[in-house]
Amino acid sequence: MMKLSDITTQENDLKKIVEYILNLAANHSVFSEVVIEKNCGVDVLIRKNSVNSIEFNKNNILTITVYKNNRKGMVSSTDLSFKSIHNVFSSVMGIVFYSSPDEFSGLPDRKLLAINKVKDLDLYHDWDWNINHAIEIAKLSEREAFKEDKRIINSEGSCFNSLVRTRAFGNSLGMIECYSTTLYSTSCCVIAGDNGDMQRDFSFSVSRDMNDLNLPEKVGQDSAKKALSRLNSKKLLTMKTSAIFSSEIAFEFFINFAKAINGNNVYQKSTFLLHSLNTQVFPNWLTIEERPHIKKGLSSKCFDAEGVMTKTKKIVNKGILKTWLLDTYSARKINLVSTGNSGGIHNWLILGNSNEGLQSLLKSMNTGLLITELLGQGVSITTGNYSRGAVGFWVDQGVIKYPVNEITISGNLKNMFKDIVSIGNDIDKRHSIQSGSILLSQIQVSGI
């Protein structure tokens, strides 16, 4: 892991490269945007207490974008040498000459940029480690999983990953910034077997700070318990029933909403929510806030991929859709202003109407399906039609009765959004969208 002093030196060096390229652009009378990313990390995979693989990775990526007379050119390279930089710049100048003009292309408005407004979001935490320590963390997770129960019969692997990323950004409007982040994760996936039935499941922990990770023992134990709970699963009859999306997969439910309000889909008129701005999309008690400046946040950023300053905002307020997710280009296409979402979303918090945990939601549902894993990609953002394979548990009188698999759940997202009855307080913070478990009044289940 790189020391803080090394990171500071690296950041200063990258900013100098960015400034040099921007000066090249100015000398050629073009507007430019420059991004440099340097990544350094290690991935350790353990299987059945043996080292399966150790991968050290270190890479650079330089991207130069040039705008001239509404024409755009972009070239990337992994070589940061002086000669390569000039070759890349010459290439991008050639591309922009032959590009078709587009009145909507160009740098963001300067007043939207995070110039002199960048704050410390506590995203970098170095860790004094050696490879043997990383191996032991992964081994410990798997070891604890096997100790949990004799029915844990195999392992698909236990992993430890660490990554340091430094990102330098600059453009011709006077913005040059650089920051570094760390990311650590550990995971374990095991197979349980009993009476001829075998089931797999996994658990993981992820954090900016190594000290905030779950203990590897807990990761292993959780993976074992989850795999064991799926043994001797049954199929369901085809029916309509109430359902709960567990907090572990709740982000997958709301990521469909994020895609539907993405500016690219809006200006291309390829979203089922095309005419839904400032209308009721969710129940009137549901609010979605974007909080990009959370300390140590997994998706925290002071500025987006174009340098536009990020801001705390309500995406949905009391069920009403308040904004699209726009970058500069999509905003200009629909005569609006960038929302600072070039590159994605930044820490969504789903705020509901309940202080209940999962057990209380199960009692509220009484009878229905608890969904713990989703399979496949059967979602159309254009129509809202939704169909995915699912794994979970059948619930009767508020109590989990048995595991179920080989089922498909389906519906239309527009209706599913409005069918949300409650959202629990069991918030999963391991994703860019943080939500508790979601109770839906009904969903179509296809089984036998």
Curated annotation (Swiss-Prot):
GO-annotated cellular components: cytosol
Main subcellular localisation: cytoplasm
InterPro entries associated with the record: Metalloprtase-TldD/E_C (IPR045569), Metalloprtase-TldD/E_cen_dom (IPR045570), Metalloprtase-TldD/E_N (IPR002510), PmbA (IPR047657), TldD/PmbA_N (IPR035068), TldD/PmbA_sf (IPR036059)
Keyword Cytoplasm: yes
Pfam families linked: PmbA_TldD_1st, PmbA_TldD_2nd, PmbA_TldD_3rd
Principal EC category: hydrolase
GO MF term list: metallopeptidase activity
Keywords recorded for this protein, A-Z: Cytoplasm, Hydrolase, Metalloprotease, Protease
Known EC number: 3.4.-.-
Subcellular locations according to the entry: Cytoplasm
Organism superkingdom: Bacteria
Example GO biological process: proteolysis
Keyword 4Fe-4S in record: no
Functional description taken from the UniProt entry: Probable metalloprotease.
Family, per entry: Belongs to the peptidase U62 family.
Name of this chain's protein: Metalloprotease PmbA homolog
Organism, as annotated: Buchnera aphidicola subsp. Baizongia pistaciae (strain Bp)
